[in-house]
A protein has these predicted regions:
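Carbohydrate transferase catalytic cores enriched for Leloir-type hexosyltransferases
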Residues: 1-379
């Protein structure tokens, strides 16, 4: 079967969908040597190798088109020009778009990955321009696609409930956790990362794009309440690049009695994440909605206990290996943090359970699920 995958998100996005695409397609390249794959890249070429540095196998080829991704997006999704993807990517039997939208197709069967429906479930947390675009593009994409992929059963249920996608048309392909996410034992590496990001000696870690959906304002409020209840030595570190309405997060930190206890190191490079997780006393992930939620599992893989929101796909991802709380309850979040930091037995149980839980999610399993979805698409 000739399969074309839009690899552009892997080149344009360092985290999130970019990381998902790199991990999944890298594992697929290691798994499948029978089908013929084209990696469609708009405007730029990938490196010479796959995600693990090895060469792409002979059944994978890269097709770079001179159009920038932004211009293609305008042509396909805003102007709705009838420009079939095959005209740019070459003849193919199946075209997979891993980033919510699906271009016009002449004969190929379409597969689209919808990572979440946050633009419908928590619309107040989405950039209005992006929300308006997704509200137009995603319903059409899932309608035209032969198969729709979701990162979790929670997102699959949302697709069925909110967009009417038949359950039999959806395949769930969870993300994997890379083997490099493990407890870092090298003191020099830990010291280097601590110095690079000016991290305090002890801290609670929050990680994600600084935007309303990640719920960092309530995390800051919970931390302030925690310090009023029972002052603890841990600072609060919120790492991530600025997103939509990020200024409100900084403003909330300044409003607190001891803003110097709240640190914003900015975007953290991928290679530094295992050390960052390892250095933290606890990882807090109070997001209002997630299609899957990779960071809590990465933290678990690094031996860090996790407190996590109990909404959307997060209970499905973390199971009983995290302390689950209501993301909208500041007092409950503060109480959960206090328990997590103060109860040694609870911490030990969550560390052990977390390591086991994270080990259940591998990119090789995800690639096997993707290949099964491709086979179903071609039936």
């Amino acid at each position: 079967v000739r399969i074309t995958i839009d690899y552009t998100p892997a080149l344009r996005q360092s985290a999130g969908i970019g990381r998902y695409t790199r991990g999944l397609i890298g594992a697929l390249a290691a798994l499948d040597r029978q089908n013929q794959y084209t990696l469609f890249c708009a405007g730029q070429a990938p490196g010479a190798g796959s995600t693990d540095g090895a060469s792409w196998p002979p059944n994978f080829r890269v097709r770079v088109v001179p159009w920038q991704a932004r211009h293609l997006g305008i042509a396909w999704h805003r102007l709705q020009l009838p420009l079939p993807a095959e005209w740019l990517a070459g003849p193919t039997d199946l075209f997979h778009s891993p980033d919510f939208t699906l271009p016009p197709l002449a004969r190929a069967r379409g597969v689209v990955t919808v990572h979440d429906l946050s633009f419908l479930t928590v619309p107040e947390c989405a950039d209005p321009r992006l929300r308006a675009f997704l509200e137009r593009a995603v319903p059409g994409a899932v309608r035209r696609a032969r198969r729709v992929l979701a990162d979790s059963a929670s997102t699959a249920n949302d697709l069925n409930r909110l967009l009417g996608v038949p359950a039999e048309k959806i395949s769930v392909v969870p993300a994997g956790i890379e083997p490099r996410f493990e407890p870092v034992r090298d003191p020099a590496c830990l010291a280097r990362v601590r110095a690079r990001y000016r991290l305090p000696e002890r801290f609670i870690l929050g990680l994600g794009t600084l935007e309303p959906r990640k719920n960092f304002v309530r995390l800051i409020q919970a931390y302030a309440e925690l310090q009023r209840r029972a002052p603890l030595p841990q600072n609060l570190v919120i790492a991530g690049g600025p997103g939509w309405l990020y200024e409100g997060i900084y403003a909330e930190a300044r409003r607190q009695a001891a803003p110097e206890r709240i640190c914003f190191p900015g975007f953290v490079a991928d290679e530094d994440l295992p050390a960052l997780y390892t250095l933290a006393d606890a990882f807090a992930f109070p997001s209002l909605y997630e299609g899957f939620g990779i960071p809590p599992l990465e933290a678990m893989a690094c031996g860090t206990p996790v407190i996590c929101a109990n909404n959307s796909s997060l209970p499905e991802a973390v199971g009983d290996a995290a302390l689950l709380v209501d993301a909208t309850d500041v007092g409950g979040l503060a109480g959960g943090l206090l328990g997590l930091l103060g109860d040694g037995a609870l911490r030990a149980r969550l560390v052990t359970a977390g390591l086991a839980r994270a080990g259940r999610f591998t990119w090789s399993d995800a690639a096997a699920g993707l290949l099964a979805a491709y086979r179903q698409t071609m039936l």
